[in-house]
A protein has these predicted regions:
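Active-site HxH/HxHxD metal-binding segment of metal-dependent hydrolases
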Residues: 1-46
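General small-molecule cofactor/ligand-binding pocket signal
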Residues: 19, 43-48, 66-68, 222-224
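Short loop segments at secondary-structure junctions
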Residues: 23, 83-86, 235
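Internal, well-ordered alpha/beta segment that forms a basic, Gly-enriched binding/recognition surface
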Residues: 26, 48-51, 62
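Binuclear metal-ion centers of metallo-dependent hydrolases, dominated by the metallo-beta-lactamase
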Residues: 47-51, 145-240
């Protein structure tokens, strides 16, 4: 409620798409009443198992938000955001098919174009698909196969790290959370590129002092914090 009201106070007028797990449909009318009048419309949608096509919200074609069933004391979801990347544009093929230069960008953006009496599809002028980007957020969860599968080859995984020490694994399991080491081990098994630990318990006042519990299993583990930012780059851009 406070976040929605804050967005209104900041002058937001653009529509907001709000997604949530099972149960959202039941509580949304009451929550919307509590927010009071807002200067922007909200489209609330309950997520099941199907991915959300993000193209309608201005993302590139093929971008998806996938709900992940996680393991917590109450029904919970993590989320995987995937951004595919088309193959490299092959101008020689476009020329051979008679595609005007003015239409090349349409093909690069996944659109089919009309050339005289026939259509030319992107697949006819693009190389093999290139590696895209994947961002995964665990939400509150104990380690589970669904999260590990979703985090395969992720560029960035934000993972529950409620407890720091290995001796707290039983407590973490009881309450549906993870330790620093468990999240790091999951990231390593999944082949993630980066791991940010999040959702610390109040007992962890200095997360950096506990980071060694994670870096033994996953050296690229970092402590997440409010406002931390990272620009993810495609592989060609990363390696020059």
């Amino acid at each position: 409620r406070q976040l929605l009201q804050t967005l209104g106070c900041q002058g937001r007028t653009r529509p907001l798409a709000l997604y949530g797990p099972a149960g959202l449909d039941a509580i949304w009318p009451a929550l919307r009443t509590l927010t009071g009048p807002l200067p922007y419309p909200i489209r609330a949608r309950q997520l099941d198992k199907d991915p959300v096509d993000l193209a309608a919200f201005g993302w590139p074609a093929g971008a998806q938000l996938l709900p992940i069933p996680t393991r917590h004391r109450v029904p919970s979801r993590g989320y995987a955001l995937t951004l595919p990347r088309a193959g490299r544009f092959l101008p020689e093929k476009a020329r051979a098919l008679g595609v005007p230069v003015a239409d090349w960008k349409k093909l690069q953006h996944g659109e089919t174009v009309q050339v005289r009496e026939w259509e030319v599809t992107p697949a006819e002028v693009l190389g093999p698909p290139r590696r895209g980007l994947k961002f995964v957020f665990s939400g509150d969860t104990a380690p589970c196969p669904a999260l590990e599968a979703a985090a395969q080859d992720a560029d960035l995984l934000l993972c529950d790290a409620t407890y720091a020490e290995p001796e707290q694994e039983a407590q973490a399991k009881q309450y549906g959370h993870s330790t620093f080491g468990q999240s790091a081990a999951l990231a390593a098994r999944a082949g993630a590129k980066r791991l940010w630990l999040v959702h610390y318990s109040p007992m962890i006042t200095e997360p950096e002092e506990c980071l060694h519990f994670a870096q033994g299993a996953f050296p690229r583990a970092e402590c997440g914090f409010d406002g931390k930012q990272l620009t993810l780059q495609f592989e060609e851009e990363l390696h020059g």
